[in-house]
UniProtKB/Swiss-Prot annotation:
<protein>
    <recommendedName>
        <fullName>2-dehydro-3-deoxyphosphooctonate aldolase</fullName>
        <ecNumber>2.5.1.55</ecNumber>
    </recommendedName>
</protein>
<dbReference type="GO" id="GO:0019294">
    <property type="term" value="P:keto-3-deoxy-D-manno-octulosonic acid biosynthetic process"/>
</dbReference>
<dbReference type="InterPro" id="IPR006218">
    <property type="entry name" value="DAHP1/KDSA"/>
</dbReference>
<dbReference type="InterPro" id="IPR006269">
    <property type="entry name" value="KDO8P_synthase"/>
</dbReference>
<dbReference type="InterPro" id="IPR013785">
    <property type="entry name" value="Aldolase_TIM"/>
</dbReference>
<comment type="similarity">
    <text>Belongs to the KdsA family.</text>
</comment>
<keyword id="KW-0448">Lipopolysaccharide biosynthesis</keyword>
<dbReference type="Pfam" id="PF00793">
    <property type="entry name" value="DAHP_synth_1"/>
</dbReference>
<keyword id="KW-0808">Transferase</keyword>
<dbReference type="GO" id="GO:0008676">
    <property type="term" value="F:3-deoxy-8-phosphooctulonate synthase activity"/>
</dbReference>
<comment type="pathway">
    <text>Carbohydrate biosynthesis; 3-deoxy-D-manno-octulosonate biosynthesis; 3-deoxy-D-manno-octulosonate from D-ribulose 5-phosphate: step 2/3.</text>
</comment>
<dbReference type="GO" id="GO:0005737">
    <property type="term" value="C:cytoplasm"/>
</dbReference>
<keyword id="KW-0963">Cytoplasm</keyword>
<comment type="pathway">
    <text>Bacterial outer membrane biogenesis; lipopolysaccharide biosynthesis.</text>
</comment>
Length: 285
C-alpha cells in the first residue's frame, strides 16, 4: 500500500505516526513536529505527524478537549506547510469529515466508533487513507468486518480500496485496565490491510485517575518491542516534551527526549523480523 508517498507493509520498514495527543498550542506543535522530523529523517523512518484538534471522548466533561476544529486545523495546516510533513488527525462525527479531509493527509477513527457503520462508510468515502482503530471491546478477527465495510463503501464511490489500515490499541481487561494480546497483530493481517500498533494507548489505564485516564508509560518500550518483533507495518506513539504537564494522556506519552533511542532499538528489531520472514505462515492450523 502507498501512504503519503511511501510504501508500507510487512515487507517494508515500519513507518511512524507520532505527536502530542492533543493540539495544546501552535508552538508546542511546531517544536515537537520539528524534533520528530529531525529524528526520523536521521533514522530513515517514514513519518506522519499526529495530533488531535478535539478529544471528544475524555473521561470527564471538565477535561481539556483541544482548541476545536477551526483553530486546530489551522495549526495542523501550518505544521504541514512549514515543515513539509504529512498530517494525521482523528474525526469524531460525519459532519467533520469533509473539512478535515481538505486539510490533513490521513484520517483516523476513534476506537469507540469502529462498529458505527454509517460513520465508517463516511470516512471511507472521504478519499483519504484511514487508520481504523480496533475497539477495546472487539476481537481482533472482527476487524475484518470493519475493513470490509470500509472497502465496500469505497467501491460504491469508485475509490481506491487499498487505503485502510487496521490499528491495535489494546483490549479491555476488567475495570480501568487494558492488555495487549500480541496474537492480535498476526490475526489482523487477515484483513489484508496494513497493521499498525498503538503502543501508547495500549498502556492507558482508562478512567484510572477518576476524572482522567492514567497510564504506564514505562511499558511503552516493552510493548513496542514486542509488536515490532511480531511484525507490523506501522507504529503509533504519542509523545510530549513534558508528559507530566501534558493536557491529555500524559501518563502514557513517550517523553520526547527518549524517542530517538527507542526508535533506534525498534529499527534493529524490525530489520531482524523482516529479514527472517514469518515462520507462522508455514504452520498448518
Amino acid at each position: 500500500m502507498k501512504l503519503c508517498g511511501f510504501d508500507i507493509g510487512l515487507d517494508q520498514p515500519f513507518f511512524l505516526i507520532a505527536g502530542p495527543c492533543v493540539v495544546e498550542s501552535e508552538q508546542l506543535q511546531m517544536d515537537t513536529a520539528g524534533t520528530l522530523k529531525e529524528i526520523t529523517a536521521s533514522l530513515g523512518i517514514p513519518f506522519i505527524f499526529k495530533s488531535s484538534y478535539d478529544k471528544a471522548n475524555r473521561s470527564s466533561g471538565t477535561s481539556f478537549r483541544g482548541p476545536g476544529m477551526e483553530k486546530g486545523l489551522q495549526i495542523l495546516a501550518k505544521v504541514k506547510r512549514e515543515l513539509g510533513l504529512p498530517i494525521l488527525t482523528d474525526v469524531h462525527s460525519e459532519a467533520e469529515i469533509t473539512a478535515v479531509a481538505a486539510v490533513v493527509d490521513v484520517l483516523q477513527t476513534p476506537a469507540f466508533l469502529c462498529r458505527q457503520t454509517d460513520f465508517i462508510h463516511a470516512v471511507a468515502q472521504s478519499g483519504r487513507p484511514v487508520n481504523i482503530k480496533k475497539g477495546q471491546f472487539l476481537a481482533p478477527g472482527d476487524m475484518k468486518n470493519v475493513i470490509d465495510k470500509a472497502r465496500a463503501a469505497a467501491r460504491e464511490k469508485g475509490l481506491d480500496e487499498d487505503r485502510f489500515m487496521a490499528c491495535e490499541r489494546g483490549a479491555s481487561f476488567g475495570y480501568n485496565n487494558l492488555v495487549s494480546d500480541m496474537r492480535s497483530l498476526a490475526i489482523m493481517r487477515e484483513t489484508r490491510a496494513p497493521v499498525v500498533f498503538d503502543a501508547t494507548h495500549s498502556v492507558q489505564l482508562p478512567g484510572g485517575m477518576g476524572t482522567s485516564s492514567g497510564g504506564q508509560r514505562e511499558m511503552v518500550p516493552v510493548l513496542a518491542r514486542a509488536a515490532v518483533a511480531v511484525g507490523i507495518a506501522g507504529l503509533f506513539m504519542e509523545t510530549h516534551p513534558d508528559p507530566a504537564n501534558a493536557m491529555s494522556d500524559g501518563p502514557n506519552a513517550v517523553p520526547l527526549k527518549h524517542m530517538k533511542a527507542l526508535l533506534e532499538t525498534l529499527l534493529e528489531l524490525d530489520r531482524v523480523t523482516k529479514k527472517n520472514g514469518y515462520l507462522e505462515n508455514s504452520f498448518s492450523a
